[in-house]
Design a protein with these regions (language model features):
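A general secondary-structure junction signal
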Residues: 16, 126, 159-161
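Thiamine diphosphate
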Residues: 158-176
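Alpha/beta enzyme core
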Residues: 1-7, 20-153, 169-171, 175
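A glycine-rich helix N-cap at a beta->alpha junction
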Residues: 8-16
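Short acidic loop-to-helix transition motifs that present clustered carboxylates
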Residues: 17-22, 162-166
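Short beta-strand segments
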Residues: 15, 39-43, 158
Length: 176
């Protein structure tokens, strides 16, 4: 960015945890970029929520919303001409209760003010290939059918290949 080596028609993407100091540094690092996607994530799976973070569903949802609101605030206040897009991942989506994943993503869509004209990319990872391809596809189908703000979202599948089923998971998820 500093040396102006990124062509104007190229979009760069950055990944940030839903943590205030990291979000602030991430947005700051984009100064001078023409087009950028800020990809926010936080873990939402039952196991990580209960064992690693020792937080409730509501606390995890609030973490995602607070991160999204901060990104929205910082990019609205941004001193530059960067064209920002946003992406959100409920990390370990396939280990998250389906209705909880839907609710979190709807809340993030609202916090970012995403619309049919300015869609949020919603990345749905099958982290460490936690479930079989058919189960992952069922989760994608449930998610897409139940997302309240479906018109304001681009669904991005993110299969892993830890057990060698990544291609099958991707193909079935696309069919969902």
């Amino acid at each position: 960015i500093d040396e102006n080596l990124i062509p104007d028609d190229v979009t760069i993407q950055v990944l940030t945890q839903a943590r205030e100091h990291i979000i602030k540094k991430t947005v700051e690092a984009l100064k001078g970029a023409k087009n950028a996607i800020i990809h926010l994530y936080n873990s939402t799976s039952t196991l990580q929520r209960e064992v690693v973070f020792r937080k409730s569903k509501e606390e995890i949802k609030q973490l995602a919303v607070d991160g999204a609101k901060l990104i929205k605030q910082l990019t609205d206040e941004y001193d530059g001409d960067t064209n920002f897009r946003f992406e959100y991942s409920p990390e370990s989506f396939s280990g998250t209760e389906p209705e909880n994943a839907v609710e979190i993503c709807d809340m993030v869509i609202e916090a970012l003010g995403s619309t049919a004209e300015n869609k949020l990319i919603v990345n749905l990872p099958n982290t460490v290939e936690m479930c079989t391809p058919n189960t992952y596809a069922d989760q994608i189908e449930y998610f897409a059918r139940n997302l309240k703000h479906r018109d304001a979202a681009i669904i991005s599948i993110h299969p892993h290949n830890d057990r060698g089923c990544g291609v099958a998971a991707g193909e079935l998820a696309l069919l969902a």
